[in-house]
């Protein structure tokens, strides 16, 4: 199922929520929104078309309609169809058709003392809710807090974020054993990135076969052990570039890389700019 991928922070902004009912034979009106429209069907079936693609959204399912795309009822409801709706705003997003249970697109970008960590928030454009009671509770609270005299305005945003994260968690479940191995490997590499750690070293430290460790990291984190180590090294390199006057050779050696030329090449490959350019940009920000 195609997905919509957001990069957070900042998180998408909640606007409003409500509920409604389509009577038997009634269709959804034709319109184009400037914001996202999340519709969760409680009972019945909603027949809706977005951008010339038709969907049947049954009870316990949701559909996420995108800004700028025309949507309308494909045909009338077969029975009374009750639903919740939620509008939120976010301009930075992309459509992707990749994978279903692979977390590679959700990979965390580690932050530093000057830069925020970045995460992926990805939702299928249509999905089945596994915990309908939780969804109903969140929507009811959002509707209550949307009342005119609500004294908890910030709670709406928190409830909305909880709802979105829950939908993502349901859509991207990872076997706990693989997840545990992947994060154990990640922690080990974070602690030993300055060393010449091989996949064999990692395997011996975790007491798992080399292929299994590598496979777990790729499925859960979307990177190989070597790629993860290099990301950790580049994060530390950025910290050193922004907080010290050390030469490239010293920084390369500090993060566990003997060849300054290869260090610079890898830094540009991962970060998009050279270490020298990065230092200049950071220096201008400080000034």
From Swiss-Prot:
Q: What positions does the domain HTH araC/xylS-type occupy?
A: 183-281
Q: Which GO terms describe its molecular function?
A: DNA-binding transcription factor activity; sequence-specific DNA binding
Q: Which Gene3D superfamilies match?
A: Homeodomain-like (1.10.10.60)
Signal sequence region: none
**Keyword annotations of the record:** DNA-binding, Transcription, Transcription regulation
What InterPro entries does the record point to?
A: AraC-bd, Homeodomain-like_sf, HTH-like, HTH_AraC, HTH_AraC-typ_CS
What residue ranges does this record give for the DNA-binding region?
200-221, 248-271
Pfam families from the UniProt entry? AraC_binding, HTH_18
- Its recorded name reads Uncharacterized HTH-type transcriptional regulator YisR
Q: Which organism is it from?
A: Bacillus subtilis (strain 168)
């Amino acid at each position: 199922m195609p997905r919509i991928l957001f990069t957070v922070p900042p998180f998408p902004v909640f606007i409003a929520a409500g509920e409604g009912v389509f009577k038997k034979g009634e269709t959804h009106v034709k319109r184009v929104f400037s914001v996202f429209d999340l519709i969760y069907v409680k009972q019945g079936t909603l027949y809706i078309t977005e951008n010339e693609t038709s969907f049947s959204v049954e009870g316990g399912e949701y559909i996420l309609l995108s800004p700028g795309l025309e949507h309308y009822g494909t045909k009338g409801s077969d029975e009374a169809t009750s639903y919740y709706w939620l509008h939120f705003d976010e301009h930075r997003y992309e459509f992707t058709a990749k994978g279903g249970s692979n977390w590679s697109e959700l990979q965390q970008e580690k932050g530093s003392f000057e830069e925020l960590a970045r995460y992926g928030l990805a939702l299928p454009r249509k999905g089945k809710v596994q915990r309908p009671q939780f969804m109903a509770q969140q929507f009811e609270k959002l509707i209550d807090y949307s009342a005119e005299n609500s004294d908890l305005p910030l709670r709406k945003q928190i409830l909305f974020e909880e709802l979105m994260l829950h939908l993502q968690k349901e859509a991207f479940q990872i076997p706990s054993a693989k997840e545990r191995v992947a994060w154990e490997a990640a922690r080990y590499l974070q602690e030993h990135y300055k060393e010449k750690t091989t996949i064999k070293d990692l395997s011996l430290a975790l007491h798992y076969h080399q292929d299994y460790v590598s496979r777990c990291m790729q499925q859960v984190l979307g990177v190989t052990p070597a790629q993860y180590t290099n990301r950790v090294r580049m994060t530390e390199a950025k910290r050193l570039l922004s907080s010290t006057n050390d030469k490239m050779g010293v920084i390369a050696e500090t993060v566990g890389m003997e060849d300054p030329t290869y260090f610079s090449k890898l830094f540009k490959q991962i970060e998009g700019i050279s270490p020298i350019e990065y230092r200049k940009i950071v220096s201008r920000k400080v000034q």
